[in-house]
Amino acid sequence: LTCLICPEKYCNKVHTCLNGENICFKRFNRILGKRYDLGCAATCPTVKTGIVQCCSTDKCNH
C-alpha cells in the first residue's frame, strides 16, 4: 500500500506503508487552520477535534 504523506492539501509525496499498515488516512484540523496530516496506519486514527478520513487503496488519501 502506498499513501500520500504531505502536510499540504495538494500532495504528491508517497510513502510505502510498513507491514501491518493497511490504511491510508487524512486528518484535517480546523482549529489549527488548514492543517492536514496524511500517512499510513494499522487502524483508522481517532481524534477529539477535526475530521479523519480513512481508505485502503493506493494514494486514496488525497
Swiss-Prot record:
Domain of life: Eukaryota
Gene3D superfamilies documented for this protein: CD59
Primary localisation category: secreted
Subcellular location, record wording: Secreted
UniProtKB keywords: Disulfide bond, Secreted, Toxin
Disulfide bonds: 3-24, 6-11, 17-40, 44-54, 55-60
Protein family (similarity comment): Belongs to the three-finger toxin family. Ancestral subfamily. Orphan group II sub-subfamily.
Name the record gives this protein: Weak neurotoxin 5
Origin species: Naja naja (Indian cobra)
